[in-house]
Amino acid sequence: MRKFTVVFAALAALFTLVSVPAQAADLGVWTGPKDNVRVSIKSCGDSTCGTVVYASPKAEADARKSGLKTLVGQQLLRDFEPTGNGSMRGKVFVPTLKVTLSGTAEFVDARTMKAKGCVLGGLICKAQTWRRIDVQSTASNDRSAG
């Protein structure tokens, strides 16, 4: 189930898209419950995408075991578009599984979203709550921790 963590981080960022048009330049940086991956969500042409801007050492190690050189810079969210009712749908790349699957995101409020990713036609799903973070204060905390 840890393999879904990256997926949910990306999906969480998508929840802000519900209240922002697909043409929006920047929807912020989002993180999952364990803060091991942070994803920046932005418009990419006619849709929305999410790219990893931070990964913990463990998340990076897991990605390397799957054949990636680095997790940072990977586009995990692709072709996300609003579906109505405060939701979005698109494709999510899961590096640790080496698969792209369908994902949804539901915008709860300006700083909270619920992300869901499923495999096997929806037979196995996992959902998490993600939060939007203040990148400047987080960067300061990262520097002071080291």
Where are these regions (language model features)?
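Surface-exposed interaction patches
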Residues: R89, K98-A105, A110-T129
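Central antiparallel beta-sheet cores of small beta-barrel/beta-sandwich binding domains
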Residues: D26-L27, P33-S102, V135
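C-terminal segment of classical bacterial N-terminal signal peptides
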Residues: L14-A22
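Absolute protein N-terminus
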Residues: M1, A22-D26
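Bacterial N-terminal signal peptides that target proteins for export
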Residues: M1-A10
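Non-cytosolic beta-sheet module surface loops
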Residues: T31-G32, V119
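Edge beta-strand at a domain terminus
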Residues: V119-G146
